[in-house]
Amino acid sequence: MSNILTEICATKAEFVAERKKQIGNNALLDLIKAQTQPRGFRAALEKKRARGQFGLIAEIKKASPSKGLIRSDFTPAAHARDYEEGGAACLSVLTDRPYFQGHEDYLIAARQAVKLPVLRKDFMIDPWQVTEARAIGADAILIIVAALDDQQMQDIEAAALEYGIDALVEVHSHDEMERALKLKSRLIGVNNRDLRDFSVSFDRTYELVGSAPKDCTFVAESGIRNHDDLVAMQRHDIGCFLVGETLMRQDDLRKATKDLLGLS
């Protein structure tokens, strides 16, 4: 695990411990009962693919540890509508507070504004967070293989399955891919960015995808800049993408999404 990831997970453990004291499990279960049914995150991506279209997960992201503030005029509901109108298949919303200036309320606002499925983008280290994710309406959660041991991954995935939501399992290496494939989820995120030096390489992604079973839905993450990148990846059987910063820095999110997807 990289130093920054170790630090983030340690901070997250403290944060989750405090959240558990503030919000009882029964309160979360009551909120889940009031939620609408999960919208089918992986299914939405596959539906786009079946139509010969790109499956875009458009990310609502205010800031990052490495880049600082990304967007000052930050309105999650409006951004969600722009992404939906631009042709995105799904949304991803950052809810991590200390490092990404995210918040659970951002996911709630975004999901209420659209009909798209929404991923809770956060550092999941405890099944309790999955319960909270469903309570605020998330249709999918993120499992970062580099941050967890096998038992932790299984426990978090089991919670997601219990609530009927998808798990996007993120990998960065062959070893992590092997561990990810021990899980039931076949929604695999391949990060183009090397966490050791933050370099971006699509070649690593192509290699990882080429070595994995064909029953997986692969999502390329990080470093995607334009439509040409999507076309290049499609040649390697990658048709789903998670894009955040590239879009969030644009003035017109709707147009930027269309341009990225080649729909302009």
From Swiss-Prot:
Claim: Amino-acid biosynthesis is one of the keywords in the record: yes
The UniProt record lists the keyword Transmembrane helix: no
Catalytic activity: 1-(2-carboxyphenylamino)-1-deoxy-D-ribulose 5-phosphate + H(+) = (1S,2R)-1-C-(indol-3-yl)glycerol 3-phosphate + CO2 + H2O
Enzyme class: lyase
An example molecular function term from Gene Ontology annotations: indole-3-glycerol-phosphate synthase activity
E.C. designation(s): 4.1.1.48
Pfam families reported in the protein's UniProt record: IGPS
GO annotation (BP), single: L-tryptophan biosynthetic process
Keywords, alphabetical: Amino-acid biosynthesis, Aromatic amino acid biosynthesis, Decarboxylase, Lyase, Tryptophan biosynthesis
Pathway: Amino-acid biosynthesis; L-tryptophan biosynthesis; L-tryptophan from chorismate: step 4/5
NCBIfam families documented for this protein: PRK00278.1-2, PRK00278.1-6, PRK00278.2-4
Protein family per UniProt: Belongs to the TrpC family.
Name listed for the protein in its UniProt record: Indole-3-glycerol phosphate synthase
Origin species: Zymomonas mobilis subsp. mobilis (strain ATCC 31821 / ZM4 / CP4)
